[in-house]
């Protein structure tokens, strides 16, 4: 137990140092920043991965951020297993550091989504449940809605259609008062996906009602 606590202490001290280093890199317009990687990862994914390897070697960014960005790059390359692996690493690092709850929530959402893409629906739902707890603790209704909708999609793919539509409706209700661009885009997307499922199930009148709401 003492060894475990000592390791955690060293990890926390290391994180403090890396946070200061990351701030300095940002101020110097370094390529080893989240913004720079985000700007190039779609057009230059291999270069983005190389820069992340260099950032890790130079200790220029927090490990959880590096693995988060690696996951993002691999997801864009449609390599979801690798994306999940690195998202999981970031999630574990955030859990140990226990000082960036927003990023931990972000990685929990990513893991739920990636597990669903990999058809690991039960795994996805476990992350959904954990993410909803985190989102409620932070009063983040948009994150909660995103997680609920992911659970609804999982239920739909597992053929629990009635439960899926109920979960979709719960997610949509959480966004019903959204007044920001991101929330409104998410609401529109959720309604569109629900409409597609209703049409697939030959529930045309229900689909039209959702379309009018949208």
Q: Predicted regions span which residues?
A:
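Hydrophobic membrane-targeting alpha-helices
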Residues: 12-20
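A "functional boundary" signal
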Residues: 19-214
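Sec-dependent N-terminal signal peptides
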Residues: 4-13
């Amino acid at each position: 137990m003492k060894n475990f606590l000592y390791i955690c202490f060293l990890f926390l001290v290391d994180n403090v140092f890396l946070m200061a280093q990351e701030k300095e890199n940002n101020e110097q317009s370094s390529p080893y920043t989240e913004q720079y990687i985000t700007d190039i990862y779609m057009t230059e994914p291999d270069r983005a991965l190389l820069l992340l390897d260099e950032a890790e070697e130079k200790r220029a960014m927090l490990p959880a951020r590096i693995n988060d960005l690696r996951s993002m790059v691999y997801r864009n390359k449609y390599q979801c297993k690798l994306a999940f692996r690195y998202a999981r690493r970031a999630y574990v690092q955030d859990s140990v550091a226990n000082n960036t709850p927003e990023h931990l929530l972000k990685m929990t959402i990513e893991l739920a989504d990636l597990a669903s893409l990999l058809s690991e629906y039960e795994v996805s739902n476990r992350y959904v449940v954990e993410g909803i707890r985190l989102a409620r603790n932070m009063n983040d209704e948009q994150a909660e809605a995103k997680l609920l909708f992911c659970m609804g999609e999982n239920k739909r793919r597992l053929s629990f259609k009635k439960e899926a539509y109920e979960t979709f409706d719960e997610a949509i209700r959480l966004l019903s008062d959204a007044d920001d661009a991101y929330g409104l885009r998410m609401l529109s997307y959720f309604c569109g996906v629900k409409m597609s499922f209703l049409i697939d199930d030959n529930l045309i009148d229900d689909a039209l009602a959702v379309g009018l709401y949208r």
